[in-house]
Amino acid sequence: MPSSWGKIFRVSTFGESHGTSVGVVVDGVPAGLPFPEEEIQKDLTRRRPGQNDLTTPRDEKDRMVVESGVFEGKTTGSPILMKVNNQNTIGSDYDEMAHVFRPSHADYTYSEKYGHRAHVGGGRSSVRETIGRVAAAGLARVILENELGISTVGFVDSIGPIDSNITEDEYPISRDLVDQFPTRCPKASANEEMETLIRKLRDEGDSVGGVVKVVVRNLPPGLGDPVYDKLDADLAKAILSISACKGFEVGSGFSGTRQTGSTHNDEFYIEEGTGKVKTRTNRSGGIQGGISNGMDLVIRAAFKPTSTIKKEQKTINDQNKETILKAKGRHDPCVLPRAVPIVEAVVNLVLVDAYLYQRALQPKWFMKYANLNAIPNQ
């Protein structure tokens, strides 16, 4: 079961929902980097369960433990192991699911592929796997912010039929603003409607999906490679690997198919004062030909409704007999509020790997775009 990602900044996650712990081993972190323990813990707290009544009532504090790769507050260049101990597990909630497959869940496909599965909490298919990715991305964010000045902010763009209707004119949106709203939709009117919808469906034993939008500012041109290692292809694979994610788009995405070339093309110009190459619109979402073009990277990720719900559903068991399931346990009625820091994290993991790869292969590019004073041991 593959559990690793990256060429240079390599991330390997481990653990299961109801196991002893979940975590990550990160290879390729440069030595001498100040270890951002407090910032990583803040990121983990943003994604943890039990934040409010819109999320699962499972109350995990998700306190990080660092076991290697850090000495006297700085990275050593050796693999960094970070983990979180699972503390609030109730395995008996899943007794019925030992032999019954939840509709639209990974239960059936894991069983068919491996012939044996950890049914409690969904095992590796649980969103708790992303704890390791969020922890690793805390390191990635330090590199990206310090060396390139990059800012990555995500927010909930829609839940069910309710759209945020946030436009580019309202950028930049700060993480502090996003976190003021329980749904992480930074538009007060839409947030209120979303809260009402989530609570209604939760009380009915149902769930709802939606879309997370992420905007990356100050991304330099040149990241990504043509054909098979395109930046948008890497982002798509990484983001679609998040539990419950079913769709991905960059820039105009599918809506661009409704336009003509003359209306969709992003015209270039030279920015007065800086001499930088810019585009008058950003329908490309910051990527052209699989390579960043210096404009904001704009992506959207679609999440399906949580598959484990308390309403009765028709399904089958592992004896190929039809049956009825009314799931027990503690589950998110909507994953979107907690998905925001997860999608941000995955975006940063892809970007830091692309940056370190470009930095190694293209010294002239590195000298042109990186803040050399922020790089340890230089």
Swiss-Prot record:
Reactions catalysed according to its record: 5-O-(1-carboxyvinyl)-3-phosphoshikimate = chorismate + phosphate
Q: How is the cofactor bound?
A: Reduced FMN (FMNH(2)).
User: What keywords appear on the UniProt entry?
Assistant: Amino-acid biosynthesis, Aromatic amino acid biosynthesis, FAD, Flavoprotein, FMN, Lyase, NADP
Pfam families for the chain: Chorismate_synt
Provide GO CC annotations from the record.
cytosol
Q: GO BP, one example? A: amino acid biosynthetic process
InterPro entries recorded: Chorismate_synth (IPR000453), Chorismate_synth_AroC_sf (IPR035904), Chorismate_synthase_CS (IPR020541)
- Outline the segment boundaries, as ranges, of region: Disordered: 37-60
Q: Which domain of life is it from?
A: Bacteria
**Which residues are recorded as binding FMN?**
124-126, 289, 304-308, 330
Q: Does the keyword Nucleus apply?
A: no
Q: Which residues hold NADP(+)?
A: 47
- Essential cofactor(s): FMNH2
Annotated metabolic or biological route of this protein: Metabolic intermediate biosynthesis; chorismate biosynthesis; chorismate from D-erythrose 4-phosphate and phosphoenolpyruvate: step 7/7
Q: Name one GO molecular function term.
A: FMN binding
This entry's Enzyme Commission designation comes to 4.2.3.5
Task: Provide the function of this protein.
Answer: This reaction introduces a second double bond into the aromatic ring system.
Quaternary structure and interacting proteins, as annotated: Homotetramer.
Check the record and name the NCBIfam families matching this protein. aroC (TIGR00033), PRK05382.1 (NF003793)
Q: Which family does it belong to?
A: Belongs to the chorismate synthase family.
Name of the protein in its database record:
Chorismate synthase
State the organism of origin.
Answer: Leptospira biflexa serovar Patoc (strain Patoc 1 / ATCC 23582 / Paris)
Gene name of the record: aroC
